[in-house]
Amino acid sequence: MSEVKLTPEQNEAIHSSGKNILVSASAGSGKTFVMAQRIVEKVKQGIEIDRLFISTFTKKAASELRMRLERDLKKARQESSDENQACRLTLALQNLSNADIGTMDSFTQKLTKTNFNRVNIDPNFRILADQTESDLIRQEVFEQLVESYLSGDDGLNISKEKFEELIKNFSKDRNIAGFQKVVYTIYRFASATENPIKWLENQFLKGFETYKSLIDLSADFSADIKENLLIFFELLETSLTNGVVAKKGAGRDKANLILDNKNELLEAITTKDFATFTELFLSIDTDIRVGSSKDEILSALKKDFSVQKQDLVGSKSKPGEIRKFVDKIKHGQLIEKYQNQAFEIAENLQKFVIEFYQSYLERKKNENAFEYSDIAHFAIEILEENPDIRETLREHYDEIMIDEYQDTSHTQERMLELLSNGHNLFMVGDIKQSIYGFRLADPGLFLEKYKDYAKTENPNQLIRLKENFRSRGEVLTFTNDIFKHLMDEKLGEMTYGKEEALVQGNITDYPVESEKDFYPELLLYKENTSDEETDESEVRISDGEIKGAAQEIKKLIEAGVEPKDIAILVRSKSNNNKIEDILLSYDIPVVLDEGRVDFLKSMEVLIMLDVLRAIDNPLYDLSLVAMLRSPLFGFNEDELTRISTQGSHDLRFWDKILLSLNKEGQNPELINPSLENKLKAFYKKFTEWRKLVNQVAIHDLLWKIYTETYYFDYVGALKNGEIRQANLQALAVRAESYESSGYKGLFKFVRLINKFMEQNNDLASVNIKLPQSAVRVMTFHKSKGLEFDYVFLMNLQSRFNDRDLKENVILSRENGLGMKLIADLKDEADVITDFPYALVKMETFPYMVNKDLKQRAALSEEMRVLYVAFTRAKKKLYLVGKIKETDKKSGLDLYDNASLEGKILEDKFRNSSRGFQHWILALQNATKLPIKLNVYTKEELEAEKLEFTSQPDFKKLVEESEKFDNIMAHSDEIQKAQKIMNYEYPHQAATELSSIQTPSQVKKRSYEKQLQVGEIQPKSEFTRVKKLDFSDFGPKKVTAAEIGSATHSFMQYADFSQADLFSFQATLDEMGFDEKIKNQIDIAKILTLFDTDFGQFLSENVDKTVKEAPFSMLRTDEFAKEQYIVRGICDGFVKLTDKIVLFDYKTDRFTSSSAISEIKERYRDQMNLYSEALKKAYDVNQVDKYLILLGGPQQVFVEKLDD
């Protein structure tokens, strides 16, 4: 990117200074490059790098920026002819590791630790990074507080009676889960404000103080209805003149009556006289029927009239927009009567939440463990209350730089205000990619500056980076066409105009002229609902959608596209399991970036949870029997039945086991010797586990169970065994995390897991070693910042998640609380019931206002999510959805009448939660998008699948095989390889000798002289240990073997031609290692290899290097005098014209030259074997052998082995 000529806007963003600058950087515009170059320029100008405050959104982004800066600073130093400037760049490189480049969380932690005394906390605090621990503490505080209120303790803010009313308003029956959810929701929202207690005290009840009646509602409440009325009146007037409504009859009379009352209805809405409007509208008959016509044109007009009238007015059973508004008014008139009751509940809720917040914070102080939000609030308090610290920092930082500014929260914004001197902010972001509203980021902060800075009189500066250097023109044109008709100020929070449109910046790699082959494709699976179960919510993806995408991916791969250049983006990871299974059935390698779902529901984890429950309480029959039936003990149904008959039906199964063991049951003769022995073995092991519960950690207990029962090995042999083993490891790690947080006891751990499962929550997914070139599956959110040649957007017909709009409370920063009220309408005149009460849940006025705000914000964010997804594609975009064959209203004809209102899609399509597909199909009909539409059925899928899996023509196969054999017979390379690969055993007597051995085994046999021929036994590299030392159970720490294996894998995939920190770190990040293992791989030390002559040799001969080279070779055993095959893998070799240079990595630890000599001797025989194999395979006489020693303290050593 640095070699590309700067655009004028990029140049301006790099060099402008002396004012606040907002850079609106569209997708693919090179914002990270711009930010890095600006920092380099600052250093060149004499600003020390530690005088820049650089905030990134994630730790990964900070690491990548730091690596990019190292590369760019080095390059700038090499190119600089100014000695002083070169010195500054050198100093910046030296101080780069100490520069303030990181997340806002990391900065606030540092600030708080440094000034801990100003907020009266211990400087050795820790972060509650584990959700489990914070959940447990919060739960305990909540339960204690609720108990104190329900017990009626003196000195509390709320009486017992009023507190019970508060709980009942949000919870069902005696369950307080609903109330707890409300409290946690408010706590989380308040924590995202810059001062939670202040917000709770001053803003929480603002909505109740502002909106006391219908007339208090803002103009937005009735704005849409006025527009709909005008459309309805115009529809009637047009229909009276064009013959749609007959010249005589009831229809014309009704239409005229409505139009006669037109002015009165509009006046009532304008003056907010909602009672008059409702009374007048309901007195008018709007049921206008127009019938049909034989005239084709008139028939179409009548049909269009009926559709529009239904949307606008509707009927009592199916109300349109105007009737819905009338229902709102009637509801509002009712809620006015109960406003005081609602306000009292809201006040009590405020009191409880404030006390909960303070109690929870006090508990965290006692634990000396805080959430990230707590630390941020401490940092704000330090800066607000201590002018000396604030001014020192303001003087220290020459510039405050913020990446991804569109995702800033109000807490972070306050920090920036306190650190800035008022004219040194440099903010980079893209409002169109603000997609973290669920994390309480506020795009309004960016939007406000975006609009203000655009004004000519504003002293600050707005710079727009519009050129997209990532994508082909077809992707950009399609993206522009979608969003210029979808986004506006009303819905989308901004107008997508000329200034916001993407411009193709890469005209070197991609042509300017469009090519139809690269047009985005809309793949719609036409589902026959009789063939597949249909989920009404349409959250679950159908097999047909995935198979359609899989077949397109298969075509791309067969055309030469690397799987790693393809991504599948999904709304949520709930469909990951199905996507992975279907792609694998097409032989498509796949990586799930966020793992498989339902970890807690996986078979192996469910079994282990039953084991833990049974150990905790053997009287729990379900878990005890499940454990006995499991592979751990393998009791079959017949055996369990025999045990069950030993006691009465109501006797616990554990007691029946004891009766069976003592032959004291009702039917002792059914306990045969085989079953008796099985029970004794179970009892011994099970009671031993129970005794250990109070002696060892749960983590250790789990690993004891895994190893003693061989269950860990058992699941490893099943399908997806590696994933299953990782799940068991994750369960043990979760137990360790639970206990390291200060919690003890199996009972509490089981309770915690049960609570997770009750709430349909899951624990974190697990990472396993992944293929290096595979199709990646990730959520839309996860894809942000990434790019792929080909992108598939799945399940587009899925409805937007609008659950938040149905919750008991909806919060807003300005209005505070909006809540639903449960009121007893027993005494209302029009309520007739025989029950003692008539409870109805109603939306209060603040709830109605907040709900409208939230709905608009949610739909606006969905638009931005779609924008992010579109702009991940470099070459081509595939949109995959579904329509139903038997439901026309869910099919394509629903969009026949879609049109634009001005330049924007009609609100009836935009203001809908029906999903992305709904928007795209409406726009396709309204504007004719540059997209290819492909509708396919299950039958077409199956026919195309046959092309991938059809049986071959065997006659043709034989002919091709003969041709191939002829080619193989004349290939020099193949003949050389066959010298090793095609050796055959001449003797069949060597049955006692392992027929295939590794170099390590060959080496071991060379010094086992005491073995006799008759004593030689087949060896395995893995020896099962039945009893493990207790302290060694489980992977508590990263082992040297794991680090060595990971290091070898890294060296295999690293590109030696680009041996720099930036490239190597990027490779390491892509490899998917566990974070603990990744942190142990010392990239800086590995790079010292390339400072040696041998390292330079490897860099210069990448095209001649073979890595991870497998070999096979026939050897004769010196004792058995029989032949066996040696198979192994050498780390690599360089094939030159006259010789081969062999190298192998070793991670053995050493600190002295004598230790190096020992390592050389240790691996001499192994390297000689590799050398012998290469000589035979390539018919060469010289193989130079080198050990690359990675286990030294500071640098890599290269040692040559003599023959």
UniProtKB/Swiss-Prot annotation:
SUPFAM superfamilies referenced in this protein's UniProt entry, alphabetically: P-loop containing nucleoside triphosphate hydrolases, Restriction endonuclease-like
Binding site for ATP: 25-32
GO molecular function, one term: double-stranded DNA binding
Domain UvrD-like helicase C-terminal: 503-785
Entries under InterPro entries matching the protein: AddA, DExx_box_DNA_helicase_dom_sf, DNA_helicase_UvrD-like_C, DNA_helicase_UvrD/REP, P-loop_NTPase, PDDEXK-like_dom_sf, Restrct_endonuc-II-like, UvrD-like_ATP-bd
EC nos: 3.1.-.-, 5.6.2.4
One Pfam match: UvrD_C
Taxonomic superkingdom: Bacteria
Subunit structure: Heterodimer of AddA and AddB/RexB.
Function statement: The heterodimer acts as both an ATP-dependent DNA helicase and an ATP-dependent, dual-direction single-stranded exonuclease. Recognizes the chi site generating a DNA molecule suitable for the initiation of homologous recombination. The AddA nuclease domain is required for chi fragment generation; this subunit has the helicase and 3' -> 5' nuclease activities.
PANTHER family: ATP-DEPENDENT HELICASE_NUCLEASE SUBUNIT A, UVRD / RECB / PCRA DNA HELICASE FAMILY MEMBER
Protein name: ATP-dependent helicase/nuclease subunit A
